[in-house]
Amino acid sequence: MTVKVRFDKEVRDYAKGEKVKDSILKLTETALAQALENFHRRMIVIEGDTLRKAELAGILAGASARVLSGILEELMKKRLRDESEDKIEVLYATDALGEETFGRKRYEAFRKHFDVLAGSNVEVKAVTFKHTRDILGRTYDLLILDMSYDYSPNDLGRIIETVRGGGLIFILAHPFEKWKNMWTGFHKSLVTPPYTIDDVKKRFNRRLIRKFTEHDGIYIITEGGKARKKPKRSKSQARIKARKGVPIPEETLFPKELYEMALTEGQVEVLKAFEELVEGGMLVLTADRGRGKSVSVGIGAIGLALALKKRTRIVVTAPELENVQALFRFAKRALERLGFKPYVVEERGLIKELYARKIGLRYYPPADGYKKSADLYILDEAAGIHVPILHKYLNKERVVYSSTIHGYEGAGRGFSVKFLKRAREKREFKELHMDEPIRYAENDPIERWLFDVLLLDAEPVELTEEDFELIEKKEVYLEEPDLDDWFENDREDLRNFVGIYILAHYRNRPSDVALLADAPHHEARVLRLKNGKIVTAIQIAKEGGIPKKVIEKMAKGYKPRGNIIPDMMVKHHYLKEFAKLKGYRIVRIATHPDAMDRGLGSKALELLEKEAREKGLDWIGSGFGASEELVRFWVRNGFAVVHLSPARNPVSGEFTAIVLKPISERAKKLIKKANDEFRIRLTEWLGDTHRELEPEIARWLFETPFGEAVDYPVHLTEIQKKRLDAFTGKVLTYDTVVDAVKPIVKLYFLDGWMKPYLDERQIRLLIYRVLQAHSWEETAKLIDRTETFTMIEVRDIIRGLWYYYKRLLKA
């Protein structure tokens, strides 16, 4: 069916009265007609310095809303929108909406004209960027994105993707020539001592502006009515094609009403896969953003709950509660469609729990969900959950892992590389990938623009046999890339660099790219093969060199942005002088996924240390989620652990460790002092704060690159010594001599390199039973032996240690 996309006389007369050129109206009509005909989005960027740009957006968006209202029924008939979506939904996003703010004034200028033209069948939601969590899982017809002052790249990714096919996006921007050289609120957040705002770069904004001009489907006008980039030809009608029919299986276990909610064949496949879960099993679902993945999972969860024909508990988890709003919303819609009256529990405006007769869905953080008893476990945005936590759900009777491959929370092949490979060894499961977009048609130009500007689909370079030979021979060199060149000239190296992070790290956000682009203290390093290919990516932050006045403030609680390691050393180790020293904090280091475990990471650290030494720096350090693999990597590369966070990260389920390696003699004294202090603390923390820390991790935290024993006096009374003799001679039991055993075990862990040899199992036993005070039953499970065997083993270990340290205590 062909529809007219032409603003009526009333709109044209009003626009004329407001001095809007007819050519600008025609440009907007054309953009809307193109969007409707292709079921894509179109974007109109309005450059300007005054409220006029917001007024112009109000007129153009109001006129567009009026046209869309007139064809709503037709869009529903063509299955381009749900029957429940019977209003034109408009989103206005800005940096501030408080009284007397410029953001508020622009919003009011927009509404003044929009409300006159849009008609009554329209709903406008205004949000600040801080509250964009409120819109996740929702869909809009028109978006007005006010980027006049502040925005973060994360906001950009999240907001743009809420607009459906057939919709328009209006961007309020400064004149490009001015914007290129402006600092935004995001830039101000990057200032850290000793830097000032003048040191902040503007690479990201310049890239964004360039991408507006490069991509199709984006038109640029000025608030004065000049078209800087316009369609090749005008268009005032659109042939609206129906969404292709989706065949519903003749025989279904779930109610047909649920299948009727599916808009693509991919969604039908997901529902069929959920039917198979009735008998138990595991489903892995991947998709690019906007493919209806979370929607399908929400509908499927309700179908499964009904098919089980019993009281059903469903645990839903994801990195953040925001991630599962579409899932909850469509689960609720599915229940309503079947005649239920669901009860919703919200937290800060977000759905957290959903209940209907004998059915309950509840969100838990990833590190808590697996501990709950349930009939189905759903892990949405699973690529954002740390791999050890993903494994905790693997043995559940029914489990669904669902993940975005590309998108603002994407993880490339990382999810497959890091998790699925190991999961296949443990159990069979069904894999589904959803290709067909649901919110808009394929090849949407705005999606292409977004993926390009935010590097959401960046991939590392492909490696050949010749490359692996170079890797084997370590024919590599470390280089500081020219970030001006990378960002301004859109070098392939930038995509390869970011691509390594996307595949290797469990969580990537667009702001990471902007941080690299603009933060004055952030730099990149790459490990290249002799032929120039990037195999290891390093992002570093220059820290330290902090003025004395700021250090005094830090000691009293002030937290300077960006100086994570100096701040920790001042607050936790009272080493104010450390904040004066300069060093590199390694923010992220990752190796090409096809070249892992070949020593490239260690080689990169070796070369970075050499560079730091030549530049006269004092230290190199890093902070990371403490897994056994990572702590071992840093310790084996000569780094000393100086801090461990008291609580686990709710998403990764890991404690954060901070490690340091001294370069200067001044730094060596301070870092050794901090490392000694940390080891002393850890012997106590393991029985309290870190009682649940995995012993295989704790074991590596005690390792030291300094090789010396901690100067920590251990005192045993004569009676305690006699009782230790009695214990090792099988006269007394362990439980009666714990007070005497613990100091000896502490001595062992605080000792230097010249200490008695214990194997890995024995070390874990001492940590788990003595320092963490777990029961004999739990300890026996840890080493997969009987309790009696475990008791004998512990006695034997203590006998050897007591024999060694007895002489030292006499001395």
Swiss-Prot record:
The gene is tmcA. It is found in: Cytoplasm. Residues 473-662 form the N-acetyltransferase domain. The lineage of its organism: Archaea, Methanobacteriati, Methanobacteriota, Thermococci, Thermococcales. ATP binds at Q267, R439. Coiled coil: none annotated. Catalyzes the formation of N(4)-acetylcytidine (ac(4)C) at the wobble position of tRNA(Met), by using acetyl-CoA as an acetyl donor and ATP (or GTP). Catalyzes the formation of 267 N(4)-acetylcytidine (ac(4)C) sites in RNA, almost always on the middle C of a CCG motif. Modifications are found in rRNA, ncRNA, mRNA and tRNA. More acetylation is observed at 95 than at 75 or 85 degrees Celsius. It comes from the Archaea. Belongs to the TmcA family. This is tRNA(Met) cytidine acetyltransferase TmcA. It comes from Thermococcus sp. (strain AM4).
